[in-house]
């Protein structure tokens, strides 16, 4: 969520329930094969790798750089996002997975538990920077104390704001609000300009909403799930405050009416056109937006109602498939993707977020402070961990969709609405 969305994940998560049930049926548990090996071999071996379409460009950039500088060769296959989970499930059952598998970070707990990935604990322990790897991704890829994956790419949520509209509204474009209450006041002033709207969200996109609003709860010191990922904690005062503000902005017209039916495909379009003052979204959106006289983009952390900051850390993890017979060559590639050479000179150079906190203040980030904000948030944000995350939160027919729709657009008290739906969400999380 990403993984998407999270920003990029909405479409691919629609098939989550079926795919994860298939994984449960075809894998009995974590594999111990070659779990203690630490060797990395670059001897001309050809290894296979799978990734999803939203991550294709990112993954291909790394593959091309590795292939150009190593004897080993990586053959990358890209699958459509909406069929990727089922493809993995089928291949896992037939023991025909590729050597290297990239996967949405929200599915890492399931993949680790079901034996899709090889245990990488001993290999990761050889990395002198292992403690600097994106903590949310590492936690998601760890099962019963063993590490099954490492960060591949990061897409995290942050506040995007249009500096042009801030100036027109008499706001300081270099000092964005540091509280949710402040975001509301700023959005209200931008909206008062008349020809634009103050704020926007994807009201019919469950992934978009959790990606951009859960950090507000975290920033307030709240939680959305229990530590086991089997119960929801969305019936809190912090959550009621957050969704109460979202509902208020819609009711007052600060958020345009079109937000109610925005299901994700075009949810960043209005901002990119310079017609929205403030909109939390994913970091990867920055690369695709063209700035000009109507749009100059500022980036800030997502705040809580009274302060604090956080981010939903989505994206992908990378691991060695349990059925691979080329683990040493696969590890050579994976470990190289985490190296300073790859993280800075390949990824940061192309305006991507580094997965290592010790490289966050790299040369390229110093040239664009927005990248520096993203890099710092990568170490501060959270990734909710639950085996049943997809069917509960990203499936448009799941219980979270009903909950957030009622919270944003319903007539009942927001707090009461969240309490009413919290039990249904918990039932889904706790289900097999």
Residue ranges and their predicted role:
Residues 297, 348-398, 406:
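Long, aromatic- and glycine/proline-rich binding clefts that accommodate carbohydrate-like moieties
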Residues 106-156, 209-212, 298-300, 364-368:
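Hinge/lid segment of periplasmic solute-binding proteins
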Residues 186-189, 229-259:
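Glycine-centered hinge/linker elements that transmit conformational signals in sensory
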Residues 91, 98-99, 127-165, 308-309, ...:
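A structural signal for short loop-to-beta-strand junctions that line the ligand-binding cleft
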Residues 167-168, 173, 251, 380-432:
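Conserved C-terminal helix/tail region of periplasmic/extracytoplasmic solute-binding proteins
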Residues 2-110, 125-129, 173, 304-306, ...:
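Conserved N-terminal structural module of periplasmic/extracytoplasmic solute-binding proteins
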Residues 52, 212, 243-326:
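Extracytoplasmic/periplasmic substrate-binding proteins
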Residues 148-152, 157, 181-232, 276:
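Extracytoplasmic/periplasmic solute-binding protein
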């Amino acid at each position: 969520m990403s993984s998407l969305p999270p920003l990029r994940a909405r479409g691919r998560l629609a098939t989550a329930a079926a795919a994860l049930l298939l994984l449960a049926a075809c894998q009995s548990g974590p594999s111990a094969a070659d779990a203690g090996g630490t060797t990395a071999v670059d001897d001309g071996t050809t290894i296979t790798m799978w990734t999803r379409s939203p991550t294709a460009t990112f993954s291909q950039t790394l593959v091309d750089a590795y292939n150009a500088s190593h004897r080993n060769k990586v053959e990358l296959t890209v699958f459509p996002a909406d069929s990727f989970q089922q493809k993995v499930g089928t291949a896992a059952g037939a023991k025909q997975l590729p050597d290297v598998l990239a996967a949405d970070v929200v599915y890492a707990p399931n993949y680790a538990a079901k034996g899709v990935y090889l245990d990488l604990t001993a290999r990761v322990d050889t990395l002198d920077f292992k403690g600097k790897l994106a903590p949310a991704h590492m936690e998601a890829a760890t099962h019963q104390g063993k590490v099954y994956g490492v960060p591949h790419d990061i897409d995290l949520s942050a506040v995007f704001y249009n500096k042009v509209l801030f100036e027109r509204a008499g706001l300081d474009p270099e000092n964005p609000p540091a509280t949710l209450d402040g975001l509301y006041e700023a959005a209200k002033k931008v909206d008062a300009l008349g020809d634009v709207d103050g704020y926007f969200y994807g009201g019919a996109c469950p992934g978009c909403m959790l990606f951009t609003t859960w950090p507000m709860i975290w920033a307030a010191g709240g939680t959305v799930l229990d530590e086991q990922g089997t119960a929801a904690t969305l019936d809190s005062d912090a959550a009621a405050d957050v969704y109460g503000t979202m509902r208020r902005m819609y009711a007052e017209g600060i958020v345009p009416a079109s937000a109610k039916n925005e299901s994700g495909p075009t949810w960043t379009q209005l901002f990119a056109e310079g017609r929205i003052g403030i909109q939390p979204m994913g970091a990867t959106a920055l690369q695709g937006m063209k700035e000009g006289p109507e749009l100059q983009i500022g980036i800030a952390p997502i705040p809580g109602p009274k302060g604090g900051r956080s981010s939903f850390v989505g994206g992908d993890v990378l691991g060695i498939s349990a059925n691979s017979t080329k683990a040493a060559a696969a590890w050579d590639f994976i470990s190289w993707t985490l190296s300073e050479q790859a993280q800075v000179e390949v990824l940061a150079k192309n305006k991507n977020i580094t997965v290592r906190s010790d490289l966050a203040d790299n040369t390229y980030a110093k040239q664009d402070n927005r990248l520096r904000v993203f890099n710092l948030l990568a170490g501060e944000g959270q990734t909710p961990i639950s085996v049943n995350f997809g069917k509960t939160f990203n499936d448009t027919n799941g219980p979270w969709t009903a909950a957030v729709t009622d919270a944003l657009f319903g007539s009942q008290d927001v707090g009461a609405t969240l309490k009413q739906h919290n039990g249904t969400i918990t039932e889904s999380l706790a289900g097999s």
